[in-house]
Structure formats: structure tokens, C-alpha cells
């Protein structure tokens, strides 16, 4: 895999280790962990092509002449991508970009005095060095401007991992942090971590009352009604805040107290800085309602809080932490709460407890090694998500007909068969029904996701409808999946991500995070809604008698939502990737499934006109993550393969009658293809919480394959211009 960014002038100033000694291990549940082996072990276990690709080594693949037809280009693309399929049938992904994740893992190891695994420290340092901005700091993600949050967290990481304060990288980072006003301007999550490290006072952290979990479930603002990622992050934060837990002072902590702030640490009145947030960090300011609630809660904590209620609150919070740990086998829903839960368990049960040891081991699942160094991924992988789309691309493009590709498809189907959740979670952890669902990553994490379940279901149905493949997922299990999906439709007729919305969007008035938008509750999304529509359409063809009327009613209502969400200019806003091209691909697909095309549907016509107005002279499309941040279509300097594929797919979905602009885009995809069949990574593709970009590097591969093959089927496998 080509590096997104390498800065040799900086990386050579720190320890370099032999990258060829890394090996990727896959467990029986599809979990992915990197291990740094000895030279003797490496000789017995040569690097695979997939490992070479991820680590940035030359694959020494034959060079192909440029493809002459779209389908040949798609075939070249899959000839490359199939080499990356792992032995258990899935495709892996770095899923990198956010710069506030690695700190959690490093802090958990440091606070618990757990030695870092071999190879971690030098590789993490390399990654952070390679992703420093020109001003010396770090942003909230790798393409973002330097912020107090990113710079302070990653500065502390470098110091914990052994970088001297006088090192040029540390000096530049510290100078940039001070230019931004110092760590006193950290947002809520940053203040929490610094307080946990004993580098900030808990009095300066806005209240995170664990007593909220004692409220009756029917109360509209009960945390069990929040978006699952937020409630599962504020759960351990509340436990830590309630107990005011922090690691002991040592020489490094005392040095960090001096280095992180512009003022003398002992002179800072931290309580005065609960709401001090750097302007460059602030994306979602506090509402007056939240500030008033925080003032009331602070008075409660200071003067009124009975010790018995505090004990009940922290006890209930820890019970829920244990439920989350047990239901995910300590993987947790994501890396943020995984690290926080690890710290909570360390303080509550001790370093020798089985729970803590399991947590520390599970943190390995989030770590990834690539040319720039070691990073922490946005989840413990994209196993089910990536495999589902790859299967769809192979079927929809017609490449499944090639005998050489059939074993790959069979292995991928077997993987999805194993990943369907066949047991219900235990305990009252506020999780949505998971029986029959597919998770985003793997079955260990096990959270229901509406679009992953839908895309996996559709992939299984497409493959099992072909004559050469076993029907591994039987009818009863397919029906369980449909049951899960049908229960997830929101009142506004759309579908959210993990579960139906449980309370109103007014909860966003209480968003305390400052750096993220639309996080407090579940929202409906055109992308998730379309995934559901297409999966249910495929299911009714496969099993036409099951809940037919309910399915048709659900689809019709969902289509109404998709139409309603179109903007006046013909676009849809994408919340899970960048941005308007991504949403257009999904929305036009849902309409096409109902027989609505350019010629008979004004909604499709407006969508096509919007997309064509954004096509660039070279035939491609381009979108920056800033489109998600601002809600306004924003381009990067050059056309991008992934966004071009999405825009073309939308036009093909709508059956746009003039093939010339579509063909122009197809020619761009073909011309952008490298001689080994792959396409180059230029920019991140994904987004979450409106403000954080994240990479899906396989998108440029399977979506290009999908679009090229789909064009050949619908418009003919030839070019006229």
C-alpha cells in the first residue's frame, strides 16, 4: 500500500526498525492483529503479498498494458485486488485518519504500567512524525489543520514513548501548542484524558455525572437513548469522573505539567477553564442550555451530592461497562471506549485481573502497521463491510463468470456465513437486537449496523442466486436478518446506523464534545436507507412470501424519505463518506430499484444535473472532506478515482441518456489505473460526526471495479470517444 505521507527528513531522526518482521495474524473470528516476529520466525513465514502491500514493499507484479475496454479494466482491477484476500476469505483495511485515537491506547498502557509490545513504540513515533503538519502540530485527523486536541494528545504520546522534550519534533509541536494557547484550550475529551493522566485537574472538566444511569429509562434524555457510540464513551468517562481517578505523579507527569501549558501549572485555576476551548478546535459550541446545566451540576457535585448516590451511580456505570465488555469479548464498540474501559477496569479490578489482561490484549485488534508507522484504526477492522461490497462488485460486473475468480467468491461467502450473529446479547446494556445481523467489522464486536447488515444480506443473496455457489446462509437465517432490518425504521421513514432513534434531535442541544456534530442521537441517513431498500428488494426476489406486505410498505416509506432528503440543487448530503457524490450513488440506486429513472423521475433528473455540473474537464469528480464539514460541495486540487466512481454509478443508476459524460468519466478511471491493475490513493474517502475524515483505501478498488463493470453491462463494453 502506498503511504499517504512519509517525511524522511523527520522520520530519520528517530529509531527505525525492520518493517519486514511484521506479520498479520487472523484469528478464527476474523480479528486482525500485527505481530513483530524474530528473524528466525520471519524466515519460516515469508511475507505474503497482502502483508507486503500493507507494509509498502514492492509486490513485483507483472506490468499490464492499458486496458482497452471498461470490463478489461475491471478485470485488471480485481486481478490485483484478489491478491489481497486473506486466507479466511475477507479483505482487510487500515481504516486510518483520526488523530485522537492512538492516545487512548498509549495512555491505557502507561497508566497501567503495562510494557508496550515489541515494535509498537518506534512505529507509533514514526506514524506521528510522518503525519505532523508543517507547523509542527496535529489536527483532529491527518488532513486537518493543527488543533489543541490533536497536538496536545500526540505530544504526550511521543513523550510517553520516550521522545526527549528537546527533540526537534517535540520542540516544534510544543511551540505550536503554545501558539494555540496551550493544553488549557483542549476540548472535553482532551481534558478528560489529561485529568486521567494527572496533567490537568478534574475541577476543570465539565460534569460527567454517572448518576444519569440511575434515571428511569423513560426519561427522554436518559443516556440509554443517546447514539450508542456517545453513550458508550461517556459511560467510562462518567465512571472516571465520578471517582476522580488519575494515575500517580511521576517525573514524566511533572515534566508534562510544565510543557503543556503557557502558564505555570500550579498557578492555573482549572475550574475557570471548563469552557476554555481553542477557536481552532471548536466545531460545535455549547448551547446556553448546556452551559446552565453544567453550572447546576457543578454546584450539585460541590455542595449537594450525597456519597451514597455517588456510589450508586459509579456502581451502575461499572455494571454497564462490564456488560459492554462481556458482550463484545472485550473488543468494545470502538477504540475510544475500548481504551477508556481498559483504564476503568485497571483501577477497579487491578492489573492482574483477567478482565484487564483481556482488555490489553484486545487493544491489539485496533492497531495497524503501514509504511508511515503504526496507527489505531477507527474500529477493529472493516471485515464484513469490505467483503460485502467486493462480492457485490464481482456479481454486478459479471466477473463472477470467470472460473479463476469463483474460489475467491466462495471463500468470501463462507466468511460472511461465519460472521452473521446467531446469538442474542446478554444483559440490559441498551443494545439493539443483534440476532441475525451482520456487524461492521467482525462477529466479536457484534454490534448490529443497518447498512452493513443490508449490504451483507444483499451480497449473500446475489451470490447464492448464482448456480455455482452453495446456499450457506439458509432461509431461516436470512429471515432473521430481515426481521432485524424491518425493526429499524425511524418515524421519519429513514434508517439510522446502529438502532432506531430513541429520542428527539433536540438532544443535540446537550452535545458536550465541542469537536463533533450530530452525535447525541441516531439520525436517519440516505445511505443507510438505500442499503436497506436494495437488500429488501433482493430478498423479496429470493424469498417472495415472507412478510411481503410489510417489506413493500417499508420500501415505499423509505423511498419517500430519500426523496424528501434531496436538496433543492438536486444533491443529497453524505454523512459516512465524502460527500455529495457518495450520497448520490446510494439515493439514485434506491430510486432506480423502484423503476424511477432520468426519463420519468424529476428527482433523478435533478440529481444528474447536479452531478454533471460538478464534472471536471478531465472527466473526473473531486470532493474534499470540507464538503462534510461545511455542507457545501468542495473540491480538492485534482480529480479522485473514488468520487468519480460514485458519481458515475449514480448517473448509471439513473439511466442518464447521454453516454458521453459518463464515458468521459469511465475513460478517467481507466487512464488512472496503474500497470499492476490498482489505483492510487490520493485522499481520504470517509467521514464521521461531520468533522472527522477517515480512510477507506479499498473503496478505490472495488467501487471502480463495480462501476466499470456496470457501465459495460448497461451501455456496452466499448468506448466511442
From Swiss-Prot:
Protein origin, superkingdom: Eukaryota
UniProt keyword list: Endoplasmic reticulum, Isomerase, Lipid biosynthesis, Lipid droplet, Lipid metabolism, Membrane, Repeat, Steroid biosynthesis
GO CC annotations on file: cytosol; endoplasmic reticulum; endoplasmic reticulum membrane; lipid droplet
Catalytic activity: (S)-2,3-epoxysqualene = lanosterol
GO molecular function annotation: lanosterol synthase activity
Pfam families xrefs: SQHop_cyclase_C (PF13243), SQHop_cyclase_N (PF13249)
Membrane topology: Peripheral membrane protein
Pathway: Terpene metabolism; lanosterol biosynthesis; lanosterol from farnesyl diphosphate: step 3/3; Steroid metabolism; ergosterol biosynthesis
EC number: 5.4.99.7
Intracellular or extracellular location(s): Lipid droplet; Endoplasmic reticulum membrane
PROSITE patterns, A to Z: TERPENE_SYNTHASES
Positions annotated as active site in the UniProt record: 451
PFTB repeats: 121-162, 555-595, 604-645, 662-703
Location, primary (coarse class): other
Record-level GO BP terms: ergosterol biosynthetic process; triterpenoid biosynthetic process
Gene3D superfamilies: 1.50.10.20, 6.20.120.20
Similarity comment text for this entry: Belongs to the terpene cyclase/mutase family.
PANTHER family named among the record's database cross-references: LANOSTEROL SYNTHASE, TERPENE CYCLASE/MUTASE FAMILY MEMBER
Function per UniProt: Lanosterol synthase; part of the third module of ergosterol biosynthesis pathway that includes by the late steps of the pathway. Erg7 catalyzes the cyclization of (S)-2,3 oxidosqualene to lanosterol, a reaction that forms the sterol core. The third module or late pathway involves the ergosterol synthesis itself through consecutive reactions that mainly occur in the endoplasmic reticulum (ER) membrane. Firstly, the squalene synthase erg9 catalyzes the condensation of 2 farnesyl pyrophosphate moieties to form squalene, which is the precursor of all steroids.
NCBIfam families linked to this entry: squalene_cyclas
Note: In Aspergillus, the biosynthesis pathway of the sterol precursors leading to the prevalent sterol ergosterol differs from yeast. The ringsystem of lanosterol in S.cerevisiae is firstly demethylised in three enzymatic steps leading to the intermediate zymosterol and secondly a methyl group is added to zymosterol by the sterol 24-C-methyltransferase to form fecosterol. In Aspergillus, lanosterol is firstly transmethylated by the sterol 24-C-methyltransferase leading to the intermediate eburicol and secondly demethylated in three steps to form fecosterol.
Name the record gives this protein: Lanosterol synthase erg7
Lineage of origin: Eukaryota, Fungi, Dikarya, Ascomycota, Taphrinomycotina
